[in-house]
């Protein structure tokens, strides 16, 4: 039996790039392993951090009697926030720390992220953050399930006033301290690059550095970028501080004593129950991106109505499969306030994933004309990310971004010039990347044709309305006014000179966020919100307080931080707060 790739693969390309027999390639919009080429060498299993490779061989499990362990603090989750929290807490207190990670390997979603450290004006991870998303591209269309498909405008930042301002301020300040702490680490200093920024020499860990996965040419996803570098750096500190890491060990319940304070954790590994007596818990267990029950409850439009819109492309989930919202059960088990009203998701698109970075970048440019399979535009392409929600309402939830040759060449030339660094180098090979996509014969990702008629036929786009839409779009480009969706004139590029390109796109998410509500010190509130649970802390995607529920399909996720920033800044702040508690 040959190896197979499981459906939750993130599409990071690492296994395909490292496969010695080139057995891994696209079939449709998913990576698959060719059984005729696979020699079952195990290289893909070795490099996959989320255990997405099914070897077909049953795992041997040795049942054991309940284990009894003891620690001062248990950290739940060995991703970015959890590993930062564990190391900082151990450094501050010298206490015994146990880290629980339910996956086979540490890292979580942060393993695939970027991350920057700097002592200069570029700022560090604690730099002021805003809602994630691309540039303002002008107003969106009507949007929402009632009004039909449209592109939502970027959110008014007044939503920040609804959030916990003291928590936001504390987390940002903690981010500055985290940045300074990392700059002084001996394990970090050899990787800092000295550059000139605004006339000043600064040391930075930049996205120009790829620490492993060197064959990658995709700037949109790790591993090997700053996110995995930070996590690896933290885990290398574990032996120094005596931190115990238990993988394949999922926390199931947080215990409290008669006063309501944390007293322990019940967990399970493949062999049985693990009971840990402790005084404190820091929860950094990730989002609920792979919990379909919670998604259906809070974000039902994440899933298509198969009767109304069959054979849809699923939303691509840029999140570890272990992101299943464990904090909900854990929080309820100990009487914490689970802030369901703030549950939200970040959707963006269209994205070209898991295909080439060149295609991904082309769709980020905003210069394309994007159509559904009926050949019609449906949103303002200049508002990067705003296409995600209206894609919900498009046939099969898939779209194509259309370029002519001068338009595509201009986008790539501009990207090479402005992106710089390693992403600029990736874009220099855009023609090679596109040819490799065409040669893969996946039947969906990219089509190139000499005429628009041929392009429509190849991509499965309804020809007559498509040709009418291109003519209408070109007319608006000449006028310099997008009469349909308000696209900025600078992004209005006519589709006139072949060969023509049709670049596949779909919806994606990097997380569904929310969980237990925390106070300005990352302490978790009790269910009555009249106080906190002594010894319980949370940070990152599973902690509420820095995000607001957008409200309806099509609205943007509203958050005061980027995801990775809230994870590591919050993890650092949690460690500082927990240290105060343990020293009492």
Report the location of each language-model feature.
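Conserved redox-cofactor binding core of oxidoreductases
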Residues: 175-272, 292-293, 349-351, 477-496
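A glycine-rich dinucleotide-binding beta-alpha-beta segment and adjacent secondary-structure elements
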Residues: 253-255, 451, 465-550
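Iron-sulfur cluster-binding cysteine motifs and their immediate structural context
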Residues: 10, 14-32, 43-59
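Glycine-rich loop(s) and the adjacent beta-strand/alpha-helix scaffold that form part
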Residues: 269-272, 276-350, 554-560, 564-568, ...
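Glycine-rich FAD pyrophosphate-binding loop
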Residues: 90-112
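Beta1/beta-strand and adjacent pyrophosphate-binding region of the FAD-binding site
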Residues: 65-81, 98
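An anion/pyrophosphate-binding glycine-rich loop and adjacent beta-alpha core
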Residues: 328-330, 334-458
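Glycine-rich active-site loop/strand segments that organize a redox cofactor
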Residues: 116-183, 193
């Amino acid at each position: 039996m040959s190896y197979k790739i499981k459906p939750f693969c993130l599409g990071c390309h690492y296994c395909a790039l490292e496969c010695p027999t080139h057995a891994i390639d696209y079939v449709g919009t998913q990576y698959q392993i060719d059984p005729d080429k696979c020699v079952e060498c195990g290289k893909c299993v070795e490099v996959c951090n989320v255990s997405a490779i099914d070897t077909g061989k049953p795992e041997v499990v040795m049942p054991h009697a309940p284990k009894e362990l003891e620690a001062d603090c248990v950290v739940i989750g060995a991703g970015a926030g959890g590993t930062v929290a564990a190391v900082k807490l151990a450094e501050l207190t010298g206490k015994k720390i146990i880290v629980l990670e339910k996956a086979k390997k540490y890292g979580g979603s942060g393993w695939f992220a970027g991350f920057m450290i700097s002592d200069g004006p570029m700022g560090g991870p604690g730099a002021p953050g805003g809602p994630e998303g691309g540039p303002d591209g002008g107003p969106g269309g009507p949007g929402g399930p009632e009004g039909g498909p449209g592109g939502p405008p970027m959110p008014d930042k007044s939503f920040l006033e609804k959030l916990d301002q003291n928590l936001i301020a504390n987390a940002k300040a903690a981010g500055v301290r985290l940045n300074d702490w990392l700059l002084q680490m001996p394990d970090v200093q050899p990787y800092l690059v000295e550059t000139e920024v605004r006339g000043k020499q600064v040391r930075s860990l930049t996205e120009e550095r790829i620490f492993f996965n060197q064959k990658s040419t995709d700037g949109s996803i790790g591993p090997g970028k700053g996110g995995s570098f930070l996590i690896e750096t933290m885990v290398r500190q574990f032996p120094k501080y005596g931190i115990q890491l238990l993988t394949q060990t999922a926390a199931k319940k947080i215990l409290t004593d008669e006063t309501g304070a944390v007293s322990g954790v019940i967990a399970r590994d493949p062999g049985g129950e693990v009971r840990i007596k402790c005084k404190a818990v820091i929860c950094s267990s990730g989002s609920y991106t792979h919990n379909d029950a919670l998604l259906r409850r809070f974000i039902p439009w994440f899933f298509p109505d198969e009767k109304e819109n069959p054979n849809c492309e699923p939303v691509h989930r840029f999140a570890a499969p272990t992101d299943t919202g464990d904090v909900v059960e854990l929080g309820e088990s100990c009487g914490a306030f689970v802030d369901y009203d703030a549950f939200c998701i970040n959707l963006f698109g269209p994205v070209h994933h898991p295909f080439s970075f060149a295609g991904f970048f082309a769709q980020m440019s905003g210069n394309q004309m994007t159509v559904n399979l009926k050949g019609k535009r449906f949103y303002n392409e200049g508002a990067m990310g705003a296409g995600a929600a209206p894609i919900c309402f498009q046939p099969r939830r898939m779209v194509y971004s259309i370029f002519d040759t001068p338009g595509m060449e201009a986008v790539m030339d501009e990207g090479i010039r402005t992106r710089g660094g390693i992403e600029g180098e990736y874009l220099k090979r855009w023609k090679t990347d596109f040819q490799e996509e065409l040669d893969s014969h996946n039947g969906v990702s990219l089509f190139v044709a000499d005429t628009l008629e041929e392009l429509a036929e190849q991509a499965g786009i309804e020809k007559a309305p498509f040709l009418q839409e291109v003519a209408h779009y070109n007319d608006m480009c000449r006028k310099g006014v997008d009469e349909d969706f308000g696209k900025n004139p600078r992004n209005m590029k006519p589709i006139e000179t072949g060969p023509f390109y049709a670049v596949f796109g779909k919806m994606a998410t990097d997380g569904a966020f929310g969980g237990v509500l925390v106070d300005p010190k990352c302490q978790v509130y009790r269910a009555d919100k009249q106080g906190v649970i002594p010894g319980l802390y949370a940070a990152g995607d599973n902690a509420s307080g820095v995000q607001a529920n957008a409200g309806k399909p099509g609205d943007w996720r509203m958050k005061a931080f980027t995801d990775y920033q809230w994870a590591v800044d919050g993890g650092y702040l949690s460690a500082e707060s927990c240290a105060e508690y343990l020293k009492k």
